[in-house]
C-alpha cells in the first residue's frame, strides 16, 4: 500500500539495516530491493511519465527501471565523491562511487544540481555537457523560524550561554570538510576583542574528540561549548538567539544550513567555497571568509559582533532573499519546468 498526502503517494520499502564491511556492496543490495518494489508499483499503478532519483545511492534501481520501462530519468547530484576528497579519490570504494556518479550523469535525460559551482564540478569530473545540467537551488521553509517571533527563549539561553554572552553558533556534522577546527582556532583572537563571545558548536561526528583536544590546547574551554547533538526545535531557537552563525566549510556543494540561519534573521559568516559563495554575497547578505584560515574566520566573526547595525542590515537583506529566491514554491516551479521539458522531448524521441 501507499501513504497518500494529497497528490503525493509514498510507498515505503523495508530494507535490512547496514551490514558487512563494504558500504558500496550494501547499497547495491538495497538497490536490488528498491528496483523490485518499483517494478511492482509500475505493474499495479500503470505507466508513469518519468523517474527522478537523487545521488549515486539509488542510481542502480533508477537506471534499471529506466531501461525496463523506457521512461526518461532525471538525476539530481547534490555532491560528488571526488569533490568531498578535494579532487582526489581515496581507495576502491571512492572509485566505485565516482563511477556510479558518472553513470547517473550519463543515464539521466537532465541533471539537476543546486549551485553553479556543482554544475562546473559535474561537467569537469564526468564530462556532462553543460547544456544538459539545470541549476535549481535548495530551499528553506521559513515558517518554523517565523513561529518563534516574540517567544520567550530564556530557557534555551540559560542552557547554552550566560545572559550577556554574544553567541557564535555552528550546527552541522563534525567532519573535516565542515572546517570546524578553523572555527575553534579563531576563538582566542575573537575573545581578545570581544570577551563576552560564547561559541556554541552543535553536532556529532568523527572530529568531535579531536575538537575537544583543540579547545583544551587553546585554553578556551570556558568560552567554547561542544554541545553535541541538538534537536531541530532547539537549533531553531539558537539561531534566533545567536549574534552570528558561522559555517567555515572546506567543501560545501550548497550549504542549506546557512539558509536556515538566514531564515532566522541570524547574521551569517561563511567560507567562500562551493555553493556557499552563491548563497551568501559578501557584505550584502553575510560575510565571506577564506576557507581553512582561522585569522580570516576571526575577522569575520569580530566584524559581525562589533558592527551590530551592519550585521542587522545584512541579516535583513538575507531574510528577504530567503522569502524569494529560496522559497519552495519557486523551486517547485523550476523543477516542474524541467519535468515538462523532459516529457516533451521524450514524446518526440524514438527510444
Say what each PLM segment does.
Residues 267-270, 280:
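Short hydrophobic beta-strand element within catalytic cores of glycosyltransferases
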Residues 117, 139:
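Carbohydrate-associated surface elements
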Residues 162-178, 184-187:
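Conserved donor-binding/catalytic core segment of Leloir-type glycosyltransferases
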Residues 72-74, 82-103:
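Nucleotide-sugar donor phosphate/pyrophosphate-binding loop at the beta->alpha transition
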Residues 282-283, 287-294, 303-308:
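Conserved acidic donor-binding segment of nucleotide-sugar-dependent glycosyltransferases
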Residues 92, 146-161:
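A short helix/loop element that forms part of the nucleotide-sugar donor recognition site in Leloir-type
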Residues 250:
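Aromatic "clamp/platform" in nucleotide-sugar-dependent glycosyltransferases that forms part
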Residues 229-230, 237-242:
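Short alpha-helical donor nucleotide-sugar binding micro-motif in glycosyltransferases
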Amino acid at each position: 500500500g501507499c501513504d497518500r498526502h494529497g497528490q503525493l503517494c509514498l510507498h515505503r520499502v523495508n530494507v535490512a539495516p547496514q551490514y558487512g564491511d563494504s558500504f558500496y556492496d550494501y547499497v547495491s543490495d538495497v538497490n536490488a530491493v528498491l528496483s523490485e518494489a518499483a517494478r511492482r508499483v509500475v505493474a499495479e499503478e500503470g505507466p508513469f511519465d518519468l523517474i527522478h532519483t537523487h545521488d549515486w545511492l539509488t542510481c542502480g534501481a533508477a537506471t534499471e527501471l529506466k531501461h525496463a520501462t523506457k521512461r526518461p530519468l532525471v538525476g539530481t547530484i547534490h555532491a560528488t565523491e571526488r569533490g568531498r576528497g578535494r579532487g582526489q579519490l581515496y581507495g576502491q570504494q571512492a572509485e566505485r562511487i565516482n563511477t556510479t556518479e558518472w553513470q547517473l550523469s550519463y543515464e539521466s535525460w537532465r541533471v539537476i544540481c543546486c549551485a553553479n559551482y556543482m554544475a562546473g564540478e559535474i561537467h569537469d569530473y564526468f564530462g556532462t555537457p553543460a547544456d544538459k545540467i539545470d541549476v535549481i537551488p535548495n530551499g528553506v521553509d521559513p515558517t518554523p523560524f517565523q513561529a518563534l517571533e516574540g517567544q520567550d527563549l530564556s530557557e534555551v539561553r540559560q542552557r547554552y550561554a550566560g545572559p550577556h554572552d554574544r553567541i557564535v553558533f555552528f550546527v552541522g556534522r563534525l567532519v573535516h570538510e565542515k572546517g570546524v577546527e578553523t572555527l575553534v582556532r579563531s576563538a582566542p583572537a575573537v575573545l581578545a576583542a570581544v570577551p563576552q563571545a560564547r561559541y556554541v558548536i552543535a553536532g556529532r561526528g568523527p572530529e568531535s574528540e579531536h575538537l575537544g583536544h583543540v579547545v583544551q590546547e587553546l585554553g578556551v574551554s570556558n568560552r567554547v561549548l561542544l554541545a553535541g547533538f541538538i534537536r531541530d526545535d532547539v537549533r531553531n531557537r539558537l539561531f534566533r538567539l545567536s549574534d552570528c552563525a558561522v559555517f567555515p566549510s572546506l567543501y560545501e556543494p550548497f550549504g542549506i544550513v546557512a539558509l536556515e540561519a538566514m531564515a532566522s534573521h541570524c547574521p551569517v559568516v561563511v567560507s567562500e567555497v562551493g555553493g556557499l559563495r552563491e548563497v551568501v554575497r559578501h557584505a550584502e547578505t553575510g560575510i565571506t571568509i577564506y576557507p581553512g584560515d582561522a585569522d580570516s574566520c576571526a575577522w569575520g566573526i569580530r566584524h559581525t559582533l562589533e558592527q551590530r547595525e551592519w550585521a542587522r542590515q545584512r541579516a535583513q537583506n538575507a531574510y528577504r532573499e530567503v522569502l524569494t529566491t529560496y522559497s519552495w514554491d519557486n523551486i517547485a516551479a523550476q523543477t516542474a519546468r524541467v519535468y515538462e521539458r523532459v516529457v516533451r522531448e521524450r514524446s518526440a524521441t524514438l527510444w
